[in-house]
Amino acid sequence: MDIRPNHTIYINNMNDKIKKEELKRSLYALFSQFGHVVDIVALKTMKMRGQAFVIFKELGSSTNALRQLQGFPFYGKPMRIQYAKTDSDIISKMRGTFADKEKKKEKKKAKTVEQTATTTNKKPGQGTPNSANTQGNSTPNPQVPDYPPNYILFLNNLPEETNEMMLSMLFNQFPGFKEVRLVPGRHDIAFVEFENDGQAGAARDALQGFKITPSHAMKITYAKK
């Protein structure tokens, strides 16, 4: 029995070793090019591992995403996509539970931020060194040499299965995208061209570190002029 088209698509055959938050970010980056994504439901229970639901605002968006990304190699496995079953109470319940958990997390984060701000205000002498230390410990950027802004981006650390279509789908959601250029004989690097420096920079910032496979976080720099 065929499932009627609806706003929610069901995805399975995904790598179940990916952390939930990383999976959600990656799915959002991939699917938001087709339209407004209302929510992404990905649970790490045994029954739901390697599966997710993506809810679009428009029906046309879910239909287009299903057609374009069917079999797309995501973290090393081809995605299987279909429309979610209509009138499914399971999806509604999962969305409700997920939303409640996220709200609690946000409240906890807000309290932590307030407490940190209060502590920093009480001890101004300690605030600056701590901030400097934190920044110093969490900046991988020096490892990736960058050049002045350019309308062409240089990608490296790409997995072996990378192809032009895969990269085009990732980058064509950004304004000004022109083309992807692969390097013959090299699967790990590629160039992406935009209309201007600013548009290239926006794509660079948004997709920096995007993982096509678990072991390959994409490194993006401006191409050397």
Curated annotation (Swiss-Prot):
Subunit structure: Identified in the spliceosome B complex. Identified in the spliceosome C complex. Present in a spliceosome complex assembled in vitro, and composed of SNRPB2, HPRP8BP and CRNKL1. Contributes to the binding of stem loop IV of U2 snRNA with SNRPP1.
Keyword field contains Glycoprotein: no
Keyword annotations: Acetylation, Isopeptide bond, mRNA processing, mRNA splicing, Nucleus, Phosphoprotein, Repeat, Ribonucleoprotein, RNA-binding, Spliceosome, Ubl conjugation
GO biological process, one term: mRNA splicing, via spliceosome
Protein name from the UniProt record: U2 small nuclear ribonucleoprotein B''
First-listed, main subcellular location of the protein, grouped into a coarse class: nucleus
Modified residues (Phosphotyrosine): Y151
Cellular component GO terms, alphabetical: catalytic step 2 spliceosome; cytoplasmic ribonucleoprotein granule; fibrillar center; nuclear speck; nucleoplasm; nucleus; spliceosomal complex; U1 snRNP
General function of this protein: Involved in pre-mRNA splicing as component of the spliceosome. Associated with sn-RNP U2, where it contributes to the binding of stem loop IV of U2 snRNA.
Organism: Homo sapiens (Human)
Modified positions (N6-acetyllysine) in chain numbering: K111
